[in-house]
Amino acid sequence: MPFSLVRIDEDDVLEYVFERYTAINSDADSIRQDLGIQDSKSTTLNIEIAPPKSLINDTNITKKGKKKKGNKSSSDYDFYSFEIKQNVTSLHSTRDNDNSTTGYVLWSLTPVFCEWLLYNEQASPLHRAQMVNICSLEKKIIHDIEFPSLLNEDTTVIELGSGISSVLPILCSNFVGTYICTDQRGILNGLKQNIANNLDLVNKRTIVSETLDISNIQEQPTNSDDETIPIKPTTQLEVAILDWETFPKSIKSGSSNILTDFVKPHGTIFLLALDVIYNEYLINPFLHTLHSIMFYYKNQREIVALVGIHLRSDDIVQEFLEKVTTEFPFKLHVVDDPQWSHSRYDIYYITL
C-alpha cells in the first residue's frame, strides 16, 4: 500500500508538532540520538545504498550498481556503493564559505531517504504516478490525488542545498531526464569531484553536462566486434551556484539561467531539499527561493517540492511549518509512512 499524505493547515501546526515529538520521545530507545552527521571524523566515507535483506538475498547483488544475472528478485533492485570525500575541517571552520559549512559533510537523512525511495514499497508513487490518499490530522481520508512520478525520464529535479556528497544526484540520474544540483559556491568543487568519482554508478543512462567535465569519464561502450552498443538514454546533470539569501523573490519571464535553460519543456519538476532547515535564519530565504521557482513554473507545468527535515529542535520545525502555512500560498502535506513516523525525520510535500 502506498504512503498517504496528511494535510497540515495553519490550525494544525501546534498539534502536529506536539504529537510528532511525543512519538519521537516514545521511540527514543530505537532512534539515533545525535545531530545527524553520517560520520563526523572520517574524510573518506564508503556508503552503501542497498535493499534490506528481507527483499533480496545478498549473494545475488554486486557493488557499483551492477547486478548478477539470476532470479527475478535480484534484477529488481540496484545496489550502489559510494566513495565520498568530505571536509570535516571545513565543517568546523568559521572562515570557510562565509561560515555556512554544513554542506561539507554527508548527513544521515540522505542515505535513509535514498533507501526508502528505491526499496520501500510504500514509496511506489515516486516510481510510477498513482493515486494516494489525502488525510486529515486524525488520519481520516478526505480525498485522493494522483501523485507525480519522481523516478521518470521526463522528470526534472532541482535540488536545493545539494551538499558535497553526490549521493542523490548520482542515484536519481539513473532514472530522471534532468538533474540540477545547487548550493553555495564553496561547496561545488567538492560536489563536482564526488560526482566524477562515483559517475560509474550511473549505468542506466548516459550523462551529458555543460557544467561538469565528464568527457573522459563516461564513454560510450563498444562490444567485441567494435560495433557500438545501442545508445542509452541521456540525463542532463548540471551543477550551479544558488544562494537563497541573494536569490530573486521573483524570476522574470524569459530569464536565462541554469534553472531555466536546462529544464525540459515537458514533464514534472521536482524540487528536492534534504536536511537544509536546521536554524531559524534559513527558513525565510529557503521558502522565498522555493516560492520563486515554483511560481515561475506554475503555469507551464506541474511543479512540486519534497522537503526532508531532521527533527531536531521542535521550535525550528514549528516555525518552519507556521511560515509555510501562513506567509506563503503553499499547500502543505507530510508523507505518512511507518518508516518516517518511527524516525526522527519528516518528508513534506509542498505545492502551490
UniProtKB/Swiss-Prot annotation:
S-adenosyl-L-methionine binds at residues 107, 161-163, 183, 244, 274. GO terms for biological process: methylation. It is an enzyme of class 2 (transferase). It comes from the Eukaryota. Its EC number is 2.1.1.-. GO terms for molecular function: S-adenosylmethionine-dependent methyltransferase activity. GO terms for cellular component: cytosol; protein-containing complex. S-adenosyl-L-methionine-dependent protein-lysine N-methyltransferase that methylates 60S ribosomal protein L1. Belongs to the class I-like SAM-binding methyltransferase superfamily. RKM5 family. This is Ribosomal lysine N-methyltransferase 5.
